[in-house]
Design a protein with these regions (language model features):
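Gram-negative bacterial Sec-dependent N-terminal signal peptides
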Residues: 1-22
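Flexible, active-site-adjacent loop/turn segments at secondary-structure boundaries
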Residues: 4, 165, 200
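Beta-strand-rich solenoid/repeat architectures in extracellular/passenger domains
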Residues: 22-31, 44-58, 71-83, 96-131, ...
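Charged, amphipathic alpha-helical stretches
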Residues: 61-63
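Short, surface-exposed polybasic-and-hydrophobic patches located at secondary-structure transitions
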Residues: 65-71
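Short, basic/aromatic recognition patches
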Residues: 92
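Structural detector for internal amphipathic alpha-helices that build alpha-solenoid repeat scaffolds
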Residues: 133-136, 159-163, 185-189, 210-213
Length: 222
């Protein structure tokens, strides 16, 4: 049974550092980036502007592994790779994660289900790949997490946003989150010590799919 749930080149040449201690990515790169080394080997905040993109061939596109923030106003994309991640914050870090209104995080695959027997109903698996996540934390994280843009994920056992530990800060998603695949999860939260806002559109499509799951919260929902 199908189940659909709806709730409303050289990297150095591509980077610049602004006066307020923020390293910006303004053009396309295929190299993954980390807050701990983004500023010529030194730590800094990362901002992908609307003209910038990070599109590695595998792994995690943006990693927060120091006490800094990551802002995406452009495009983060990985295609057809199991285990791929868009933005990941390592356990114990302090900062913030923002997928802005113009930001896109796409972790997808070329496969698309079709109507094999021409009965007007899509046949076959929803997705072939697995374990893909748009935004993730690997443990406790301190700082706000905001999605006002678009997160598109294709893969079984995959998630749009999945927190792997408690969040000390506010959580907001008022953009779009779309996940396709069996056991898909749109948004998954652990304990949140802050405000939680689930708005915009959250879509999880597949067998045993879940649009939103909040394991526990000491926050105020809005």
């Amino acid at each position: 049974m199908r189940k659909t749930l709806l709730a409303t080149t050289c990297l150095a040449a591509l980077l610049s550092t602004t006066a307020h201690a923020e390293t910006t990515i303004t053009t396309a790169t295929t190299a993954p980036v980390r807050t701990s080394t983004i500023k010529s080997g030194a730590p800094d905040d990362i901002k992908i502007t609307s003209t910038g993109s990070v599109k590695p061939t595998s792994g995690t596109a943006v990693t927060i592994d120091s006490n800094h923030k990551a802002i995406n106003e452009g495009t983060i994309e990985i295609s057809n790779v199991n285990g791929a991640r868009g933005i990941v914050a390592e356990a114990g870090t302090v900062g913030s994660i923002t997928n802005a209104a113009t930001g896109k995080i796409i972790i997808d695959e070329p496969y698309a289900p079709t109507d094999i027997d021409n009965d007007g109903d899509i046949d076959g698996a929803f997705a072939l790949g697995s374990n893909r996540v748009g935004i993730a934390t690997l443990g406790a994280f301190t700082g706000n997490i905001v999605n006002s843009g678009a997160i598109t994920i294709e893969g079984n056992d995959s998630a749009g946003i999945r927190l792997g530990g408690p969040l000390t800060g506010n959580f907001t998603t008022d953009g779009t989150v779309s996940v396709l695949g069996d056991r898909a999860l749109g948004v998954g939260l652990q304990d949140v010590a802050g405000n939680v806002r689930l708005a915009g559109t959250i879509t999880a499509t597949g067998l045993d799919a879940t649009a939103a799951r909040v394991a526990r919260s000491s926050s105020r929902a809005t």
